[in-house]
């Protein structure tokens, strides 16, 4: 995108066990202006430093990475294991949250920057995480064909609840 060509970004990715697939994943992510890519498995210390150094941080917080560092927050009316990193990073750094909406088009991508969220972080990590999920849900409802439905968003369940997959 034009943004990543003009402004170096920091982003997080999940390192893959298969070295060939991992190399392909990294090559795809590194094609825009050599962003700083941080492996999720390394933790968030480097992300905190990058934010404090003034780098924009491109963060995709709606993946189910399991129970670690997650809470259950509603997503389409279903409790979804949701990482709390967005709220925690905003609290630790004072970073403003600027939602980015990306649409695939026949010619590439359209990227829309929304106004920064007001009052975020709010009164609690739980409220912030529910707010984030509600925002994502609203955007998915507007263009469901754009969402990454192949990701098993509800694979981690509250204790005692049956897995849907």
Describe each region flagged by the PLM.
Residues 1-3, 24:
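Hydrophobic alpha-helical segments in the ANL/AMP-binding
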Residues 4-7, 41-165:
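Non-catalytic C-terminal accessory region of glycerolipid acyltransferases
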Residues 10-41:
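Membrane-interfacial amphipathic helices and adjacent loop/beta segments
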